[in-house]
Amino acid sequence: MRLLYFSMVLLWVLGASECQVIPSSRRTLRVGIAAAQDTQSGSIGWASCGGTLPIAVQYLKSKGFLTDFDVEYYMEYTECDRASVAKAGMKFMKEMNVDVVVGPSCGDALAIMGTLSAIYKKLVLGWGFVSDTQLADTNRFPYVASVQPTAQTLGLATSRILEMFQFDRVALLYYKDDQDYCKSVMDDVEATLSDPDLYPVRIVWKGELQSDNEALTRSTLQAVKSRARIVLLCAISGPEKRNYLISIAQQNMTTNEYVHILLTMRSIGYGVQTSLGKKTFANGLTPLWESFTVAPDGNETNARRAAEKMLVIDVNSDVQDAEFLQYLTKNIADAVRNPPMKCNTSECINASSTSMGSYARHLFDVFYLYGMAVSKLNSTDPTVYGNLNLLMPQMVTSFDGMTGRVQIGQNLYRVPTYQLYGLDEKYEQVALVNMTFYNSSSQLSRGYSDEGRSVWHFWDGTRPLDTPICGFSGRYCPVQFWDQYGVLIFVASIVLIFLICIMLMCFGFMIRGRRAEQERLNSEWQIPSIQLIMPQKEKRKPNSRRSLQSGPSTITGESKMTIDGGFHENYTVQMFEKDLVLTTKHHSMQMNKEEKEKFVKLRKLEHDNLNKFIGLSIDGPQFVAVWKMCSRGSLQDIIARGNFSMDGFFMFCIITDIAEGMNFLHKSFLHLHGNLRSATCLVNDSWQVKLTDFGLGALLEEHTPSKKRLLWAAPEVLRGSLTIHQMDPSADVYSFAIIASEILTKREAWDISNRKEGADEILYMVKKGGNRTIRPELILDAEVSPRLTTLVKDCWSEQPEDRPKAEQICKLLSEMTPRGNTNLMDHVFNMLEEYTSTLEVDIEERTKELTLEKKKADILLSRMLPKQVAERLKAGQTVEPEGFDTVTVLFSDVVKFTQLAAKCSPFQVVNLLNDLYSNFDTIIEEHGVYKVESIGDGYLCVSGLPTKNGYAHIKQIVDMSLKFMDYCKSFKVPHLPREKVELRIGINSGPCVAGVVGLSMPRYCLFGDTVNTASRMESNGKPSMIHMSEAAHSLLTDHYPHQYETSSRGEVIIKGKGVMETFWVLGKTDSDTKSLSTRTTPPITDENWPPQMKEDLKKRAVTPYPERQRSGKSKMDTLKVV
């Protein structure tokens, strides 16, 4: 909308001269213009700048200025020629009597026009190259006004910047132009920098550059490289600045050693007035590294990287109306060609619509300044708007123009606000320093806090030096230190090493001492987790012969309560340094130095009513706090059991103990307990209450407390969810009152088991508070003092400030002490005399009986089932069948047992088998084999289940079989000493399934063809021989080669299997002598078998066992065969 408005205004301007009828009451401003057509056309040429005047007039009218004025323009092209300027000045001022003269835009020419203005008392508006300091002299040029600052102020700003960065060695470079503008500026800057009253700066090189002479530029830059690292540059046009960036990039002058400072007074900073660039700054200008042609030249990257090493000192360029500046740039060419300018020269006709002259914005601002002053004076008195004595004070003002913030001083020249510009990471120009100069005084303010990150971030954060460390030629590097002082260093090094060794030794001893002291302090409270062990019960291994017997078991340590129970669930009884201790587990956390120092103090905390903190174990998955054992358990447990009678004095002493412990904690470095409950009040052998779980701080905060634990929490803690570090000691007083109510009523907290409200409802009502607060009901005995109950009620007051202090509680309790009863132990002993001989004895005896019976039951169960299976059954879990890839099964049978049994009585048979199998059971335990069952004279064992052992099962079975054979050789039947007991053993290896069968009298049974084949190996074996299948033989020889001697039996017809090759186990090979450590009778092979034996074998393969074998093995076959 704003651009549309200005477009409509411009169209109105272009047609105003032909269509508008001027009323007689309007006044006309006659403006004489001394313009340049060919001189510096890109900067002050009328074709690129003149269009700003009609646009400025309409902009003034849009702001409410010059509304009663028409403007007439009278043009003279003086080209900055002195004679032409003098002629035009005489014409404008003497003949035409204009109101104001605009221009000329060159310094020398403006001096002539200013001289004429002093004679004819006409106002002259200076713009362009008019920064000479002499033009601001009001004595010589009283009627010259300009929005340009003087070059002297630029020199002062440069001096302050060099002083701020401590740069005292610089080079000055400037581009040559037709009017020698940059040379004049650099002369003023050089003169200012040479002022002895200012910061001393040495100018080591001053050179001229030419935009069309690259050779001169290269040679000049090479000369600068050998003399300076801080370069001050003056350039007029954008192409000159860009060419300089490309040149220093080519000469490798864009390293971190160089700082290039562009000096300008055109309020453009890093910008250029063109609309061809791809990027624009916030003020509407195009960055100077962008290409100024329609087709980019490919040097944008190099130019931009060179711009990183450039700073800019310029007049404040913060244009407030960037949108209008873009509008001015695009429409200035049309405005100069159309009425009222009507410039019809070839330059005007061919003027570019994409850019404007460098000083066009200054022409706009200086005429805007004049228009405002005329309007203000006209508003007061329309007849005196041309009176310079009245007009000039109106021009001493400030406004936001197209060149930034403009402030005009008493000399009608601009009071400059210079800024040091730099580039940020996004290549946006930022103001780093603001400098204001007026009447030789200056004010400087930094716009950054970190110089390295703000000013020198393209220099890796380090301010460059104006002189390299090694000089400009690199010949002045310091002499190598070793070359100069080598011998001295060698001698000094020996002495120094010797001294260092002594110092290191001393330092080492000191460090060692400190470390030892630190380790000693840590060892006081840090307990290795390996030193905390659970109290073990001594057990005897059960055997087959005495499967129902159990030896006595003892529990280490002495306690009034059992180790497995009797304490609150948060406590665990463990052994530490042969003493029973109480432990609590906590989440692990990272402890700081303060926490560790607190635990050192905590361990040293001693009081009769505080439980001793022994230490903390921090090397396990959880932290474990270790406390001294209090054998009678917690106060909560004692109250819950309800088997101890407490009279009034006893309850009073318990409450007093708690109060004394709490008071001591409140006066200590801990200041409070923070977790006070009846569960944290332990009772020792002497019936003395000791507070525990204090001082753990952050460890307790890691836990999420249960609802029941919060029953002791104060209302303010519940409402604010306060941590221990945020709690007040009054919260402990509230918890003390709840514990006291438990003691006085002899019931658990809040009598929760008998209340209709649950824990959640009670906590909600406590947290809610109000006039009718909920508290535990005190149903008391007659012997309880009313003063004590009153104290308890005061302690659980709703407001923390209404609760008494712990010290006051102790004082009040001491005043309530009953006379004549001062020793709790005497009182307790008297009270417990009647229970000592009965109650505890009965409890201990029943406990022992229960433990003994449980042990017997466990032993009996372990005899029937594997330990793992028994544990799962005791836990009520279902035992699923489990498959095993490879196991070894053994069947054994007593040869001619029927005949042997016929010679014995039934009791003798039982004793015979018991003696035989008891020793077999011992052999089984030695080899880690599991005995499945024994039925009659049959024996079934397996290895590899229920615990898998790789391939060791074949070795264990074979070794056990050889032991069986050895034992049978020496076994004697007591009542038949001449009879010899022989075994027939069969072995097979393979997969198997095992599981528990039945609910009543459950048995651990084996299923699978592996079991059946092992049975066939036994039934087809020979007396005193170990018969194994080919699968078992392969497993034995593959995994234990050369350890056992075996022999092939050859192919044998096996019932249900057909022809199988089987093997005999002869014995175990001694690896040193290659002899047999155990050897059975040499086998009979198919080659040396008698014909009668072969026939017998065939009959046995197809004929069932005798009746004794079938009847004796019927139950076992049920378990073996699937």
From Swiss-Prot:
It is a single-pass type I membrane protein. One of its GO terms (cellular component) is plasma membrane. Residues 508-1122 are cytoplasmic. Residues 536-562, 1071-1122 are annotated as: Disordered. The chain crosses the membrane at residues 487-507. CDD domains: CHD (cd07302), PBP1_NPR_GC-like (cd06352), PK_GC (cd13992). Glycans are attached at N252, N299, N344, N350, N378, N434, N439. Keywords: Cell membrane, cGMP biosynthesis, Glycoprotein, GTP-binding, Lyase, Membrane, Nucleotide-binding, Receptor, Signal, Transmembrane, Transmembrane helix. It catalyses: GTP = 3',5'-cyclic GMP + diphosphate. Belongs to the adenylyl cyclase class-4/guanylyl cyclase family. This is Receptor-type guanylate cyclase gcy-5. The gene is gcy-5.
